[in-house]
């Protein structure tokens, strides 16, 4: 994103779309669970979904964690929902939300320009699809709003690190989610180290249930003021990285706002909110990990798990 085009008409459209989506329902996080045999709008029972998810896990050789919450019916689907998984870039929604809530005042902080260098891009493992563009490096600065946006829409690691720096480091994200009632999710390191994803590591992790509820509070609840909630949702709606993951598994006419993540050991994640036509939204998370360090990520597993959720809850 070039600084001179930081407020394209697309953003206005996305913000309006986000506002319409937000008007559909407000998530009130609860503890209710659907019975195993319960049926709602979807064609399958929760117990059927759990069996299908177990089958996907066996076939893939990965560990699969899933949690989804239908805000209209209160039905849930849970599979390894309370196990810890590496979070990877799913954290970027949290860091951007923390900037909006804790640092921005009436949009003034969002318009501040942040200086950065090629070294910053390289320290983020060279993963700066927007910050590393020649035209952006030539100016050596992007606004806070632009950096938050591209950290989500393009999963720009350099942008995320710059926002972590403004927040005071990764621990600020942990403090932020604790203030939302999330006692599980934690961020300890910077990009790219946080993606090391060794089996058994507890740092830089979350659980499917915890991150689903936190995303729900941010997008559908009152964790952010309405203006910030619309802006965060517009970034999630504009995400470009989930085409082979959630987007591939959900029906084409379901609006999707999400954030992906990937790391070593085949870690491959997607978390977000989807709005079926004429229905209350569904908040959903799929987290996966394997046991071999150089294992390939399995986008199809994430897409297939999302498809099970859509067929069960949709």
UniProtKB/Swiss-Prot annotation:
Family: Belongs to the class-A beta-lactamase family.
PANTHER family for this protein: BETA-LACTAMASE (PTHR35333), BETA-LACTAMASE-TYPE TRANSPEPTIDASE FOLD CONTAINING PROTEIN (PTHR35333:SF3)
Listed name of the protein: Beta-lactamase
Top-level taxon of the source organism: Bacteria
NCBIfam families with a match to the protein in the record: bla_class_A (NF033103), bla_Exo (NF033099)
Remaining remarks: The class A beta-lactamase family has a specific amino-acid numbering system, sometimes called Ambler or ABL numbering and often misspelt as Amber. A multiple sequence alignment was used to derive a consensus sequence and then the consensus was numbered taking into account insertions and deletions. This allows use of identical numbers, e.g. for active site residues, despite differences in protein length. UniProt always uses natural numbering of residues, hence there appear to be differences in numbering between this entry and some papers.
GO molecular function, one term: beta-lactamase activity
EC numbers for this chain: 3.5.2.6
Modifications made to the protein after synthesis: Predicted to be exported by the Tat system. The position of the signal peptide cleavage has been experimentally proven.
Pfam families assigned: Beta-lactamase2 (PF13354)
Keywords: Antibiotic resistance, Hydrolase, Signal
Region (Disordered) location: 31-50
Catalytic activity: a beta-lactam + H2O = a substituted beta-amino acid
Active site: 89
Gene Ontology BP annotations: beta-lactam antibiotic catabolic process; response to antibiotic
Organism ancestry: Bacteria, Bacillati, Actinomycetota, Actinomycetes, Kitasatosporales
Protein source organism: Streptomyces albus G
